[in-house]
């Protein structure tokens, strides 16, 4: 009986050690990849943003959403007031194509940079800037980029003080 109990305990201990070692190995490999990569994730996303011509179609789409008073949650079927529905759809499709060319890890950071660029271009107030960020937040969902979903950044703008 003692031998069986010892065998069960030894098996459990071995399983625990193997599990612990594989978790440690995975973490170490991940950290080594980041350490050996001279360009960190932030710089890589910044570079992608610049190479993708600053997500021009997405910036134009966000700007139009803000001017039309739309926040988040639009769909590919939305109509645009001052353009025909087909032209608005094409602009959104171009934006989605730009986003699909990004690495999944860079989609939200580059969208945030694009939203900031749109906010700064027109010198919009806090309300309009909030709408721009809100539109950007939902673009991965609208474009059905499944690896990303919704961007986690806030729809409040850090360079505008909150109202109390």
UniProtKB/Swiss-Prot annotation:
Source organism: Arabidopsis thaliana
Molecular-function GO terms, alphabetical: nutrient reservoir activity; protein histidine kinase binding
Function, in words: This is a 2S seed storage protein.
Protein family according to the UniProt entry: Belongs to the 2S seed storage albumins family.
Domain of life per record: Eukaryota
Gene transcribed to yield this protein: AT2S3
PANTHER family, per database record: 2S SEED STORAGE PROTEIN 1-RELATED
Membrane spanning residue stretches: none
Chain positions listed as propeptide in the UniProt record: 22-37, 73-81
Protein name as catalogued: 2S seed storage protein 3
Keywords, ordered alphabetically: Disulfide bond, Seed storage protein, Signal, Storage protein
Subunit structure: The mature protein consists of a small and a large chain linked by disulfide bonds. Interacts with AHK2.
Span of the signal peptide: 1-21
